[in-house]
A protein has these predicted regions:
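The substrate-binding groove and active-site-proximal loops of carbohydrate-active enzymes
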Residues: 3-13, 52-62, 96-103, 196-203, ...
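Active-site beta-loop-alpha junctions enriched in small/polar residues
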Residues: 10, 37-39, 87-89, 153, ...
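Metal-dependent polysaccharide deacetylase catalytic core of the NodB/CE4 family, i.e.
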Residues: 36-134, 158, 225-235
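Well-ordered, non-membrane alpha-helical segments in soluble/globular domains
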Residues: 15-22, 57-69, 104-109, 205-211, ...
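Structural preference for beta-strand elements that scaffold enzyme active sites
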Residues: 2-4, 31-33, 79-83, 123-125, ...
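N-terminal regions that are enriched for targeting/export leaders
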Residues: 1-32
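C-terminal domain-boundary segment and adjacent tail
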Residues: 33, 213, 217-284
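Active-site-adjacent pocket scaffolds in enzyme catalytic domains
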Residues: 25, 40, 45-72, 125-224, ...
Length: 284
């Protein structure tokens, strides 16, 4: 099985200490893929300090030189991977930036090149803010040769004219009807690939994530834990789950102790040959 971690919202306001505290120990065992906002707009995102929220001012990543230097060093050492997380993330006129916003082709192109030039590393994956994207957003990332760090679906932009859309849709339908949990493989849509993020958040269930993890293990598939550095200390709403960080640590402990698990970056997993769905149920 391939295991990876996706962390969202690194931006101008993020400090190296925050990320080091969150992932200093974890990256001794495998990389963490950071979804980075290139030009953070201070809107409603909780990764933005409360005193700045609602000002709608724009803060380019390069203006936090301490963070940029720390990221460059961490990426060069293989501790982290840079992924593109929207452009501004928050848009005063558009609830979901990449569900139907303006100039999406330009934003994807400019945002990618900005991060690559700034951090000295390739960007292979796009993670839309709020995991929400539309048809134009998917076209934009496909044109740039990027993959999607979540799953979209027919209603969120998969081309109705592509045979791969319907073969993937049918495969997923059969998987779910047979009792399958999560999506333990990479989806290949032809012009781009997608990897499901398994949420590790205050509202997620450790029991459910462990079931998805077990299913991916049985299939020799993929498991991507998706979280936010800024909420690792927040308690989970489900009993016996502890904090978000504790839930993540439980999954990490399993991944690092099992010799059958290959811990890779999101970009490495999604860029490799896609894992095809297997017939039948995932045994409980």
């Amino acid at each position: 099985m391939h295991f990876c971690i996706r962390d969202d919202d690194t931006n101008f306001f993020t400090t190296p200490d925050e990320l080091e505290h969150a992932y200093g120990e974890i990256t001794k065992f495998g990389p963490v893929s950071l979804a980075i906002i290139p030009f953070c707009r201070a809107g409603t995102n909780k990764a933005v300090p409360e005193k700045w929220r609602g000002r709608w001012s724009v803060h380019p990543l390069h203006e936090n030189q301490a963070l940029v230097s720390w990221l460059r060093a961490g990426i060069a050492k293989g501790r982290f991977e840079a992924m593109l997380h929207g452009y501004h993330h928050d848009d005063e006129q558009q609830e979901w930036e990449f569900a139907g916003g303006k100039d999406l082709f330009q934003k994807v192109s400019d945002g990618r090149r900005y991060l690559e030039d700034l951090l000295g590393a390739p960007v292979r994956v796009f993670v839309p803010p709020h995991n929400t994207i539309g048809r134009q957003g998917l076209k934009a990332i496909a044109r740039e040769g990027l993959h999607l760090g979540c799953t979209a679906g027919v209603r969120s932009g998969w081309s109705p004219l592509s045979p791969m859309t319907w073969s993937t849709w049918l495969r997923l339908r059969k998987w779910r009807s047979s009792g399958g949990v999560g999506i333990p493989w990479v989806l290949d849509l032809g012009d781009h690939r997608e990897i499901a993020g398994n949420p590790v958040t205050p509202s997620s269930s450790l029991q459910e994530n462990e079931a998805r993890y077990e299913c991916a293990m049985q299939m020799g598939g993929v498991f991507c834990a998706a979280t936010h550095y800024w909420e690792l200390n927040v308690p989970c709403i489900h009993s016996n789950s502890g904090t978000v960080g504790r839930q993540l640590q439980s999954l990490v402990a399993r991944a690092k102790s099992d010799p059958q698990v290959m811990w890779r970056s999101v970009g490495d997993v999604i860029s490799a040959e896609p894992f095809l769905a297997q017939e039948g149920e995932c045994a409980p």
